Amino acid sequence: MKKIFFQFSFVILIIFLLICINTVSFAQTTVADSSKKSFRLFEDDKIIEITLSLDLTTYFKLKPKDEYLKANLTIHLSKKDSISRDIGLKTRGIWRNQNCTFAPIELNIKKAAFGYTDLDKISKLKMTPQCNFNKINEDYVLREFLAYKLFNVLTDTSFRVRLLRVNYIDTQKKRKPIIQYAFFIEPLEMLSARTNCLPIKLRTLNQKNIIPRIMDRLSLFNFMIGNYDWSVPGQHNVSVIKSLSYEPTGLGIVIPHDFDWTGLVNATYAIPTEEIGTENVRERKFFGVCRSKEVYKQELDMFLGKKAEFYRVINDFLT
């Protein structure tokens, strides 16, 4: 009887060990497979639902730019599935930082370990929320998002964006949850790696340091959307990168960002300065380099060739 009991117990032990081994192996495989997946943060267009938990009073009133606030970011993958990680949050920008209730945000997700290849390569992620609470500010942030998508039509060397619906939760429980639109902006390092380029930080650059056709394309695009709020010198609302695979001339590629002062957005606060010489941002003025009509005609023909795609992007956005 003891022998039978011993054999039976031994068999149970072996089965238990096999189950444990298989369970451990399966868990390790799952983690490994997850780490190889891309979240497709800037490849897909579907709106992302996120929850951002932080001390809203400190964010609204102090708008810290030097030190990160403790925050928690939850990405809702579906109605039942989500990823939640502790992160750091601080504000950025100049005009909107000083004048908006919701200042532009930088999320520090370097140590978040989401388990997705693209997310885990990002250290700092820019987020553009709507400026204030009312409906018109919701329209502004959506139109600014659209401006990025329109420039994507012209070139791959452009900042990709991802639309968000954000649920702001006050960790101090002094405010009710706030739900608004916002969008993520592709980090410059990610854009540079994607296009095989190198970021150029020199503030002394001017338009003559940019590849001519790239400079003309940007000037015409800004004319099209009524954008005066940019400058290559000082890299005001533009970033400059240099290709590592072509253009041996050493000239750079200029990429625009921050479109809230454009005629396309038409924000009430976007008032041209006296130096611009226009009454409003919907009155166009061209700020390109002086070139021949033939040169600009080539670039204008390219814009006309993209007309159908421009309309497709706009119509898809409106539906």
Predicted features, each with a name:
Residues 1-29:
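Bacterial Sec-dependent N-terminal signal peptides
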